[in-house]
């Protein structure tokens, strides 16, 4: 697959998330990018994007501030925490095998079961190998000259990618 085909395929896969057609046509020396995409967040959206992009042949790094996957279901462990939508809405539909491997115990699952499902997904598709945990992102900057994102972490590390996907969710900042 040539560079233009890869760029079109990547913009198609992640287009609904953050990329416009204009953004997918960036000019410049993108060879300076360490990854095709840097994803911030390893909740359900971040894991889904990692799975989809990896299966399309793209190099991906996920940065997660916690020490495991699950997003809001990792952080919110208070007694009685549960989803307010049917548990099936948390089920990924991209794999029939995955759907047949998991059976929700109740219509509106509690936090422990949803977190178990997130861990099952991470294990089933070996997602953790591309996730760097305990990495709090402090900034994401786009260099228009070379068409590369630099995502900086609190530790001082920088990660570069042709694309940056913010999968932090609406519950990632306390209020």
Predicted feature locations:
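Glycine-rich FAD pyrophosphate-binding loop
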Residues: 54-75
């Amino acid at each position: 697959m040539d560079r233009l085909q890869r760029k079109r395929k990547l913009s198609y896969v992640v287009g609904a998330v953050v990329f416009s057609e204009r953004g997918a046509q960036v000019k410049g020396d993108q060879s300076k990018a360490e990854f095709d995409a840097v994803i911030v967040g390893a909740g359900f959206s971040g894991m889904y994007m990692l799975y989809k992009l990896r299966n399309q042949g793209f190099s991906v790094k996920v940065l997660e501030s916690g020490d495991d996957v699950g997003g809001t279901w990792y952080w919110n462990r208070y007694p009685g925490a549960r989803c307010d939508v049917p548990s099936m809405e948390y089920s990924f539909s991209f794999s029939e095998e995955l759907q047949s491997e998991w059976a929700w115990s109740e219509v509106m699952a509690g936090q422990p079961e949803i977190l178990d499902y997130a861990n099952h997904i991470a294990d089933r598709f070996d997602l953790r190998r591309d996730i760097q945990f305990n990495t709090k992102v402090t900034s994401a900057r786009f260099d228009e000259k070379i068409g590369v994102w630099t995502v900086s972490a609190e530790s001082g590390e920088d990660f570069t990618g042709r694309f940056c996907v913010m999968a932090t969710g609406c519950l990632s900042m306390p209020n």
